[in-house]
Each structure stands twice: as C-alpha cells, then as structure tokens.
Amino acid sequence: MTTIRLKENEPVEVALRRFRREIERTGLIKELRARTAYEKPTTERKRKKAAAVSRTRKRLRSQMLPKKLY
C-alpha cells in the first residue's frame, strides 16, 4: 500500500500531487484498470507482443540517422 507523510506546513494539494505521482510510479492505476475486466491469456499475450514490437520500432527510429542533413 502506498502511503505518504504530510510534511509540516505542506498544503494538501501538494501532498495529493505527491501521492498521485507515487501511485503512478508504482503502476497501481494501470494494474487496477487491467483488472476491471477479464482478459483472455491469448489476448494478453497478443497485446504484450504488440507493445514490445512498438517499443522496438520506436527505439530503432530514434537510433537511425536522417538520410540527408541539408
């Protein structure tokens, strides 16, 4: 469970922002959204494979040099 401690004289809005950032970093929101509905194992594998291909293409695109620089 994610917890934060309020610092002395810290506004609630700032503490809430820190809490949201911490939740985002741990991936809790993403996991909760994934668990709202059942996903078949084949669909999950297919989705993860597509994400991996997308990440690889993005990485390759960033490493490629432009054809001409003029």
Curated annotation (Swiss-Prot):
This is Small ribosomal subunit protein bS21. GO terms for cellular component: ribonucleoprotein complex; ribosome. Pfam families: Ribosomal_S21. Transmembrane segments: none annotated. GO terms for biological process: translation. InterPro entries: Ribosomal_bS21 (IPR001911), Ribosomal_bS21_sf (IPR038380). The keyword Ribonucleoprotein applies. Residues 39-70 are annotated as: Disordered. Belongs to the bacterial ribosomal protein bS21 family.
